[in-house]
Amino acid sequence: DKNCVLQAEGSDQWGNITTGIDLIRKKTGKEAYGFTMPLVLDKTGKKFGKSEGNALWLDKNKTSSYELYQYLVNVDDSLVIDYLKIFTFLSKEEIEEYERKNNEHPEAREAHIALAREIITDIRGEEEYLKAKKISDCLFKGDITLLDEDELEDAFKGAPSFDINVGDKVIDMLINAK
């Protein structure tokens, strides 16, 4: 229907690739092809994905831009340059410059911030990147009162919380906290 003749998957998905190629051939009568790409692993060698419970979603309703920003600026130093090479359209020279800066002043996190900027801007737009950066800057360097209600919700989505009633005693709240 979509004139698809290429099945692309992670290197651990060879069975899915061959099944996809067979399906394309049977449905269209056309030749189909497959290719694999290396898996993206975390610093412990664990792959990313739904089944691993550590998926990063393109859909901002599943992974907010702030969550994605925080993940990317906290990527292990040993992975950030590889991620710039894999996930961005930065030139070889730009990446080499970030690598130099990262080696000289890792605490500045310039490569990490570039990674977050490039990925979020590419998949969600500059406005989402700027919103995520604003939330992060307000929480970690500035004034949280500068955040609007939506930004606060993004910042604290998933944080442990519970409802309280006005007039409850502190001791009762502590006992009922989960």
Describe the residue ranges of each PLM region:
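NTP-dependent nucleotidyl-transfer catalytic core
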Residues: 1-21, 27-33, 46
